[in-house]
Amino acid sequence: MSIKKIFTIACLATSALYIQAADHCCKSLNIVSYNVRNGIGIDNVNNLCRTISTLRSTSPEIVCLQELDSVTGRMNQRYVLGELADSLNMHPSFAPAIDFMDGKYGIGILSQTKPISTKIVPLPGREEARTLLIAEFPEYVIACTHFSLTPDDQLLSIPIIEKEAEQWSKPFILAGDLNTEIPSATIDALNKSFVIISQTETPTHPSDKPQDLIDYILIDKAHAKEIKVTEAKAITGTIASDHIPQFITIELKCNKKCCK
């Protein structure tokens, strides 16, 4: 049996231990993580309509997006996240990572409702600055990121994220392009405080001939028992980006805040 298969079995066992069904669940969420490459497909055609169609097919409440331009010369001063938000009737939250061609380049979150608050946290990235975008909602917290290509920077990012997660008394869901596969030192480090709740069988890059699983959705272990994952899959068959989206549906455990 390969190391990857052994790790996958271990992940599933860990998930079964931490992610349990609540007796009564009162809120269901569709969550997507997608590196959209500004709507540039694997065929190098810039067609944001394909991205919109892919996302619309998932009926998402939350979308975590990576590789977004904001009014750059490269994208003819278009606000890509805003266009996606308008087309999907969602609220945009943008976090710039770097200045680029008279604009910004970074990550974003789309949400059906406006967040209570948002926070941008810098992360290490020696080849390119990285960031963490945190959005608070009444019953949960969403964090979107795009890790550095450098393993050392990935490892340095994890304690920063753990510190942010520890501040919340509700589920902290982390999603993004982590630029690392299973197994790796980065995943091993994340597994100490988080549980992977997205699928781990289907590679997510490149979209035409997927070979690498580098996109994930996770939850902090402290609150993992407060959700139930009812569906987890990769959205295959799309060439709208060089990545394949990760999709999950979760049920949030019933509590006083959401059961009123």
PLM feature segments, named:
Residues C25-C26, S57, A85-D86, M101-D102, ...:
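Extracellular/periplasmic catalytic domains that process cell-envelope and extracellular macromolecules
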Residues L29-V36, T51-M75, I142-T145, I161-I187, ...:
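Active-site beta-strand/loop signature of hydrolases that rely on acidic residues for catalysis
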Residues S28-I40, K119, I134, E139-S148:
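Active-site-proximal beta-strand elements of phosphoester/diester hydrolases
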Residues R56-P60, A85-N89, S93, P115, ...:
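Sec-exported extracytoplasmic/periplasmic mature domains
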Residues A13-T14:
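Repetitive helical segments and hydrophobic/amphipathic motifs
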Residues S2-F7, L17-S87, D99-M101, P159, ...:
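N-terminal, active-site-proximal structural segment of metallo-dependent hydrolase catalytic domains
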Residues D43-N44, I52, L68-Y140, E226-T236:
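Structured beta-strand-rich core segments of catalytic domains in phosphoester-bond hydrolases
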Residues I120-P122, P151-L155, K163-I173, N179-K260:
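Metal-dependent phosphoester-hydrolase catalytic domains
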